[in-house]
Amino acid sequence: MCDGEIGDPVTQPRSEGGGLVTMDQETRTHYLDAATDKHLTNGSPDPEPVDPLLVAQWSIENVTSWATCMEHFSRTLLDCLRQEAIDGEVLLSLTEEDVRDMRYKLGYKLTFGELKKFWIAVLKLQLLVKNSSAESVILGIECHGNGNSVYMPLASTGCGPPSSSTCPCPQAECPSYVSDCDTYLRMGGRYVPPEYFKTAMSLGYSFVVTWITSLTMVIVHERVPDMKRYPPLPDIFLDNVPHIPWAFNMCEITGSLLFTIWVVVLTFHKYRLVLLRRFFALAGTVFLLRCVTMLITSLSVPGTHLQCSQKDFAIDDPNVDMVGALIIRMSRAYRIWSGLGMSIQGVRTCGDYMFSGHTVALTLLNFFITEYTPRNLYFLHTLTWLLNMFGIFFILAAHEHYSIDVFVAFYITSRLFLYYHTLANNRALMQSDSKRTRVWFPMFSYFESSVDGMVPNEYDTLGSLIDGIIEQIFKAKDQLAISVKRCWLDAPLSGNSSAHMFGGESEQCLRNGTASAAFFSPHQSLIGGLGGQRSQTHLNSAQSGSSTPTPATSAPTKSLPTQKKTFRDASVDPFSRTTFAAVQQAENVKDSPMKEKKHL
């Protein structure tokens, strides 16, 4: 229905000539005293009729009077209308969310029932004006048919009376900053900016975490328990499944296939930067947690086929100092980092058991592919889940991890993914207590601050993708040219540079003992702002009267360093005290010939 969650639609009588339209008695809500049968607000049982042609021209007092006559509203609500400057035009463009914000964002102490009654009154007034012949009034009236807030101008629409099943409200026009108008309208007026800087920040965060993980794997390999003293722990799955030598390589091939699918999804998805930002943030967080669990507890080697020993990575050379040991560990960490920790890349590590990094990678790729592909791609979703499960099975069949390692990795990764996207897709959960969200989830609050709701799964064609790449290249070139021009041609002059530019000329004038107009010419615009054309005349007069002898009492004399400092300060700061002193001195110099003549 057309009026959303408020109630049944209300159809008002329409005037052919745009005259007065009086609301029906059934649609009017009164608060009557049983004893006196009078209206509790103004003592009149019938409010004045409303002219829909004049509602948009109401002043703040007219709106307050209308609210007083319509319902028994509290003084707090009336004060809110006055303080927030709600006039007729603003009243007609109010939405249910705006009315709700009076209590939850603006902080007015209004009851829930009063807010609902005020919104019902506003909605009735909006429908009354919309159904009248006031076609020359541009209004922002909300269509509540599909749950999306779509605002449209009434003059160009002529949206008819609301019905119980349909709401013939037209679509709004896109703002100028939206490049994809169809996506903007399908998202209900929401726009998802790419935010390159935030994506770069998430990439940097993930990059740092991968280096920390590699260094942690080097350290835990040095602390791996001795296989002779600490045999493999009892495990239900490992004790009943024989060792398959090629299984771990198959697990990594499975992960590579999932990664290839994810790269294809990223390439053609319209909001690829949002997906990248979320992937890097979640992957970095999970692997950072894995560094803690690997380091605090060292489990014994899960299989006897693994050749793991502390001597392989131990640094026992007494000639190696702390810096040398750090360099050796960093070189080993680089080998792990460059090989992505994969055995098919020649990387062999021990001790990094709790929890499984391969399971984390498989689960993250599976969940991201499933989330950001259309729901009707059942074959793709089934394939990714099969690859995920078979990858986990291959890890256990290779006896490279305990069962608890795989289970904890799958649980933590899946829960973190679901919690993150639950908060991101439901904006109200994050905005209900924004301060606490920023404290407990600072990275989430930063990365998702401009994303409102679910990201639609929309894809670019190959042609549009190429056009977008070319457009981004030209846009980057234009931005670079503008930045170079701004830095090279439009660089503002600092105080030191201006003093350096005009300092030589001022020193020349001071050595000549005259305050010539040429000295002041670079600063006429500065001093002219203080005295206009008058100050320029004074300076020129000072030049013409410089040859006339001036009595000692006509103008105060200053030493050469004082004058030099005064003019330097005037060039740097035209509003300093020394600038006014220089102007006053010039006026005294101008008046000195008249005083001398009078003295003679």
UniProtKB/Swiss-Prot annotation:
The chain crosses the membrane at residues 200-220, 246-266, 279-299, 349-369, 377-397, 404-424. It catalyses: an N-acylsphinganine + a 1,2-diacyl-sn-glycero-3-phosphoethanolamine = an N-acylsphinganine-1-phosphoethanolamine + a 1,2-diacyl-sn-glycerol; N-hexadecanoylsphinganine + a 1,2-diacyl-sn-glycero-3-phosphoethanolamine = N-hexadecanoyl-sphinganine-1-phosphoethanolamine + a 1,2-diacyl-sn-glycerol; an N-acyl-(4R)-4-hydroxysphinganine + a 1,2-diacyl-sn-glycero-3-phosphoethanolamine = an N-acyl-(4R)-4-hydroxysphinganine-1-phosphoethanolamine + a 1,2-diacyl-sn-glycerol; N-hexadecanoyl-(4R)-hydroxysphinganine + a 1,2-diacyl-sn-glycero-3-phosphoethanolamine = N-hexadecanoyl-(4R)-hydroxysphinganine-1-phosphoethanolamine + a 1,2-diacyl-sn-glycerol. Residues 541-562 have a biased composition (Low complexity). The active site is at 358, 401, 405. Pathway: Sphingolipid metabolism. One of its GO terms (biological process) is ceramide biosynthetic process. GO terms for molecular function: ceramide cholinephosphotransferase activity; sphingomyelin synthase activity. Residues 425-600 are cytoplasmic. It holds the Pfam family PAP2_C. The modification Phosphoserine is found at residue 525. SUPFAM superfamilies: SAM/Pointed domain. One of its GO terms (cellular component) is plasma membrane. Its EC number is 2.7.8.-. Residues 58-129 form the SAM domain. InterPro entries: SAM (IPR001660), SAM/pointed_sf (IPR013761), Sphingomyelin_synth-like (IPR045221), Sphingomyelin_synth-like_dom (IPR025749). Keywords: Endoplasmic reticulum, Lipid metabolism, Membrane, Phosphoprotein, Sphingolipid metabolism, Transferase, Transmembrane, Transmembrane helix. Residues 1-21, 530-572 are annotated as: Disordered. It is an enzyme of class 2 (transferase). Belongs to the sphingomyelin synthase family. A phosphatidylethanolamine (PE)/ceramide ethanolamine phosphotransferase that catalyzes the synthesis of ceramide phosphoethanolamines (CPE), a class of lipids that is a sphingomyelin analog and a major membrane constituent in Drosophila. Transfers the head group from PE (1,2-diacyl-sn-glycero-3-phosphoethanolamine) on to different ceramides such as N-acylsphinganine (dihydroceramide) and N-acyl-(4R)-hydroxysphinganine (phytoceramide) to form N-acyl-sphinganine-1-phosphoethanolamine and N-acyl-(4R)-hydroxysphinganine-1-phosphoethanolamine, respectively. This is Ceramide phosphoethanolamine synthase. It comes from Drosophila melanogaster. The gene is SMSr.
